[in-house]
């Protein structure tokens, strides 16, 4: 990357950065007049009259910030308070719970969780209770049943119907429940219709992506504009990537990244644009053979507009430069592509379809710039603990090489019990792939018939320190025709699976932060590879996690090619055993606004490399601030 390229990229992106605001300025008067009180990104299950169970915390202004909302479709829970008894008035037979005055009548049933009956005199400050009853207009809560809970912790939960809904800013809504203003933001989880967790309100294009900027009440300017930001510092140290004991190689790279985002929303119209800046300074381990390099850039990022409920209810149209993300990042993640994209959702079914290219970013590899992408994703939540997804990716390359993969994938995600989670990704690749024959100079184009899979499970016994244990296996098929002698032409279809080129292969495995689940150091593309992984993790506190992983790498077909890794060394092509790697990942996120991650990797070369090959290591520390 050179500064000249990045400046040119920024200039060429200017029209796209101005596209959303230009359209907004033309449409905003009409949209402002017709803007409904209900936020366009609020989940359709949240309507006036719906019975909800809200878990959260009180704020100094008396409002209730929702962490999680569960929609009770049957509507048979009534009204409930779940929290700590704050005070007791024996003469009036009243309690204070979650700020509510609870009137205990002679016919109120009081019991422990074991169904053992107790009396009013057993109710004392500090006890965690569940109160069932009804709130009267004056605010007093008349108790029908009071149950003393067994485990004591500071619970704050209310249950009742949604009385009203109001928009409070970009990505913000206020629900009225039991007379309390309940604040809903992009960090609020929703569980509805026996489905999985998802954001109760959405602003951007993705759900659950840790790389998204954070929208809160603090970064709102007026009712229709939010200014977001992120600052990230990273230090990476890579040693011995060539596995050569006779040379000192590697580098230390401190880097600083900054992002500023601007989101504006009028009714069903949302426009978003962002600017990015980065600076990297590379220090080689051996100054006698390499020189220091310093690179900085400033460029445009996402710039799109979204029309919700267009062209019909449950549909959204998005046009502009936008990110593509899916939960396991196995097919695609976080590549800004210039796209026309349609989202749809109805009940437990959701889909998206798009056509995209990379029009402006000249710093990308040629594979991205020359491809027209057609992407489709379908998700069906069979029940709360089981989901089925299907993916289709076609990257049409009109150059002479005709590298045009066509990937069809199927995914199953399951969380059948509180102790077990599993996943299974199956993919088939068709299309065409070309390569230049170094002997003849001829471009050889072959059809592709390849396959890949990634299956695994995580077990959580739910005991002290919240340990977890993971086992997984991944396979990307290879092709023995790639090992032919020079000048000999391959025949038949190419059996080598290649990922889309848009993937990042990251996950968290019950951790606070995500990491490269195929290895922090090797971090390979899943092509001509078999990867066996064992992992163990601890979650001693909600904001802290530790993960230890072991990976074993084998080539499906012995080859001298190793795609997209941190290593400079090439395997011999005689032995399939590439080696093994140990990874350690520590994550700490005490607040949504701050995250610290520490990662380390130790790669031990196997029989595919020379006998005197020595290990390679990598260590990374990253601090992130969102505001």
How would you describe each model-predicted region?
Residues 2-11, 15-214, 286:
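Short, flexible, surface-exposed loop segments at domain boundaries
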Residues 311-317, 325-486, 539, 550-552, ...:
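Signature for the C-terminal beta-barrel architecture of outer-membrane proteins
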Residues 61, 88, 138, 165, ...:
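Short coil/turn motifs at secondary-structure junctions
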Residues 79, 156, 171, 256, ...:
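Exposed loop/turn and edge beta-strand positions of beta-sandwich/beta-sheet ligand-binding modules
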Residues 205-317, 344, 413-422, 429-433, ...:
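Beta-barrel outer-membrane channel/assembly domains of diderm bacteria
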Residues 320:
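Aromatic-lined carbohydrate-recognition surfaces of secreted/lumenal glycan-active proteins
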Residues 292-293, 364-365, 400, 432-445, ...:
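Solvent-exposed loop segments that connect transmembrane elements
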Residues 61, 138, 300, 334-337, ...:
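Parallel beta-helix/beta-solenoid
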């Amino acid at each position: 990357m050179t500064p000249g390229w990045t400046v040119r990229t920024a200039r060429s992106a200017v029209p796209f950065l101005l596209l959303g605001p230009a359209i907004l300025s033309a449409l905003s008067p009409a949209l402002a007049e017709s803007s409904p009180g209900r936020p366009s990104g609020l989940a359709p299950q949240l309507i006036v009259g719906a019975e909800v169970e809200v878990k959260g915390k009180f704020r100094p202004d008396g409002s209730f910030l929702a962490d999680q909302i569960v929609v009770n479709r049957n509507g048979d829970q009534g009204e409930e308070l779940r929290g700590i008894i704050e005070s007791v008035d024996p003469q009036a037979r009243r309690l204070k719970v979650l700020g509510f005055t609870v009137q205990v009548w002679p016919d109120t049933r009081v019991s422990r969780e074991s169904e053992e009956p107790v009396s009013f005199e057993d109710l004392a400050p500090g006890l965690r209770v569940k109160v069932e009853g009804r709130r009267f207009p004056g605010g007093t809560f008349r108790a029908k049943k009071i149950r003393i809970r067994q485990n004591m912790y500071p619970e704050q939960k209310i249950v009742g119907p949604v009385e009203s809904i109001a928009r409070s800013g970009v990505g913000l809504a206020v629900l009225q429940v039991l007379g309390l203003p309940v604040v809903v933001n992009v960090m609020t989880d929703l569980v509805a219709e026996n489905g999985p967790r998802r954001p109760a309100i959405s602003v951007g294009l993705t759900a659950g992506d840790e790389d998204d900027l954070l929208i809160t009440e603090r970064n709102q300017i007026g009712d229709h504009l939010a200014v977001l930001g992120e600052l990230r510092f990273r230090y990476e140290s890579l040693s011995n990537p060539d596995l050569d004991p006779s040379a000192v190689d590697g580098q230390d790279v401190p880097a600083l990244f900054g992002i500023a985002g601007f989101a504006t929303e009028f009714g069903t119209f949302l426009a978003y644009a962002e600017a990015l800046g980065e600076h990297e300074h590379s220090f080689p381990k051996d100054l006698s053979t390499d020189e220091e390099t310093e690179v900085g850039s400033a460029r445009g990022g996402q710039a799109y507009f979204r029309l919700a409920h267009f062209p019909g209810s449950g549909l959204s149209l998005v046009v502009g430069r936008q990110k593509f993300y899916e939960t396991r990042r196995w097919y695609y993640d976080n590549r800004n592509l210039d796209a026309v994209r349609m989202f749809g959702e109805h009940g437990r079914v959701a889909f998206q379809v798009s056509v995209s290219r990379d029009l402006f970013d000249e710093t990308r590899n040629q594979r991205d710039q020359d491809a027209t992408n057609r992407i489709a994703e379908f998700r069906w939540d069979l029940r709360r603990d089981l989901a089925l997804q299907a993916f289709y990716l076609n990257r049409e390359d009109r150059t002479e090489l005709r590298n045009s993969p066509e990937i069809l994938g199927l995914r199953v995600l399951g969380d059948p019990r509180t102790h077990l989670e599993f996943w299974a990704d199956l993919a088939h690749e068709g299309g065409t792939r070309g390569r230049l024959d170094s002997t003849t100079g001829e471009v050889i184009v072959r059809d592709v018939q390849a396959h890949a899979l990634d299956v695994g499970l995580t077990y959580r016994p739910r005991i002290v320190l919240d340990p977890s244990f993971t086992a997984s296996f991944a396979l990307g098929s290879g092709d023995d025709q790639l090992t032919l002698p020079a000048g000999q032409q391959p025949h038949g279809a190419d059996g080598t699976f290649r990922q889309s080129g848009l993937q990042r292969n990251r996950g968290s495995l019950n951790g606070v932060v995500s990491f490269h689940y195929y290895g922090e150091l090797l971090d390979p593309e899943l092509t001509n590879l078999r990867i066996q992984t064992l992992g163990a993790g601890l979650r001693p506190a909600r904001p802290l996690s530790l993960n230890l992983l072991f990976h074993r790498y084998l080539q499906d077909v012995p080859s001298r090619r190793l795609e997209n890794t941190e290593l400079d060394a090439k395997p011999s092509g005689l032995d399939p055993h590439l080696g093994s790697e140990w990874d350690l990942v520590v994550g700490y996120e005490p607040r949504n606004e701050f995250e610290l991650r520490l990662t380390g990797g130790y790669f031990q070369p196997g029989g595919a490399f020379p006998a005197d090959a020595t290990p390679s290591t990598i260590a990374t520390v990253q601090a992130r601030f969102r505001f």
